[in-house]
Amino acid sequence: MPTIYNNGTTAANTDVVNSAYGAIDRIYKSDIRAALAFNSLNGFNKGAVENGRILEEMFIEMATPYNFERGSTTKYFTAEDAKIHTKYYGTWNERQTSKEWYNYKIREMLDSGKSVDEVAQQIVVSVASGDEDLIYNDLKGLLLNAKAAMTPFAMNSTPATLEDLLLTIRNAVSHFKFANADYCAYKSKTPTENIRVIISSYLINQIDVVKLANTLNIDRAEIRNLFWEVDTTDNVVYIVDVNAIGYFEKNFDAYTEVRRPLRKMISYLDHDVLYYYCDFFKATYITYTPE
């Protein structure tokens, strides 16, 4: 059983106590580590906004060709108006992450080889990690909400075997490369470098990497770029144009406030984030339904 000391902290186990004298044995090394976050969806980050609040997405439709009529004075002299579509987004998630600490309390727990600055630095890291983890979970929620507006992949939206799933993913990726309006509002093609497959770690761990590379005709290095892994346990695979989903940032400001009368330090991170889903760009999903 862990030993609970009178300051409320928990020791690893009772063997840190000297059996002869009952005191805690000398600590020979103290490792200081902050909790870290990993955002596998940070490729959706569209950058920082310096001024303004409103995001405008503008899409220009593909022009319609006409048959050339020799001798005609109408069709090939009359150009149609460019068809431009716009969407506007202005809902920012304004938030602040913070942690406080007391230098004198930190000194009480450090050995002679450590400094308060080392601990303070890791506290600041933990603040940033908390913010990054929130963005990651927000993006997973955004995908789930956007799914309701997406059209499932038509060729085989519910493959029953892993082999069928891989073939369906390949078909979806190929379909995105051609000009069509099947999974977006207006006819367009998606450049290969903009296509991403978002898949759960639970599902991709069941797939043989060699078979995956062979089926999609890509090498292992390209797999990491094409596939974005998320820590979910569902069987939904999203195929998206990276422009269909994204987030912008503004007011990113990290600072530490010193409160001398209280002998306290507080680290803050201000960070506003705007998330969006735009159907001008292709997005679809496949649901793996094993037999």
Where do the model's predicted regions map?
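Alpha-helical scaffold segments that mediate packing/assembly in large oligomeric complexes
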Residues: 99-180
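Assembly/oligomerization interface modules of large self-assembling protein complexes
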Residues: 18-101
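Sequence/fold signature of self-assembling virion shell proteins
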Residues: 2-24, 175-178, 183-291
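Intrinsically disordered, low-complexity regions
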Residues: 9, 23, 44, 48, ...
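Context-gated lysine
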Residues: 29, 46, 75, 83, ...
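Generic structural signal of hydrophobic/aromatic residues within well-ordered alpha-helices
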Residues: 1, 17-27, 32, 106, ...
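Alpha-helix boundary/N-cap detector
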Residues: 8-15, 19, 23, 97, ...
